[in-house]
Amino acid sequence: MFCWEHPKRIFPQYPDLTRQQFSIWEGVSHGFLGKMSPSFPGIAPTILASRSIGLNYPTIAGMLVLPFMGFFYPGNPEEAYVRAYETAFFDIGYAREATALLSAAQSLAVIGCEPDFVIEEILNLDPLSLGGSFGKPYVIASLPDFLLDAKSLTGVDLAKYLSKRLSHYNVFDPFRAIVIALLVSRAHSDDPWLALQVAVNQWDLGQNGSPRRFADVDCYASITGSLLGAFCGSGSLPLQQVEKVLESNRQVYNIDIEITAKRFIDLILQLSSD
């Protein structure tokens, strides 16, 4: 809401574009606060709060907006899970579980736990009792088959497996994203640069199984990267490649990632102190 109401505070040079970008959050944010939305007159706040960011299916929004939550609760996966779940008020369905599990995994990875141990721990994590009479929560109930099938796969073979095995999931599906993050981190936690290459080489396949286009690969890389950072540390990527990415974003998009990150951190600290 703050970004939508005060776009000049976020990107002073692009207030209109900023407001437009954050408009997808306006409806659900007003609804969560129990208020009517100026963009959706006549729709009750309870409905606005349940419609996510305007899509009626689970998405990766929470994992993209909260990729840092687990770092706040090192060694405390249950607390990381609960806080991420609470904060992702805009997620619906198992998207909130996926967001919470990513946070829990980070909280363990950042204290030095190995990927296999982290995965085993989160498979038994349900502090909010999301499971019921019919079994475990969706994400942790569905993960084991993928973990077993891909146990020996790495590199190109893993990328191909993930593209094919997850092809029936929407490209924005949170389960698809967390499967990629976990399997890639397990296979290549010793080589985060290769891990990111596997994460970004994911295809959206047609009905006959042939590649149509890349899936939502930048988002998969961001989500996977947030977990790899916990496993490997911020200085584990090749400096030359980091500089290349920073410069490419400056040249192509006129975005300085380092300045934007600092502005975001400063804004969070400011809002936290208000």
Residue ranges and their predicted role:
Residues M1-D274:
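Structured, active/binding-site neighborhoods that engage oxygen-rich ligands
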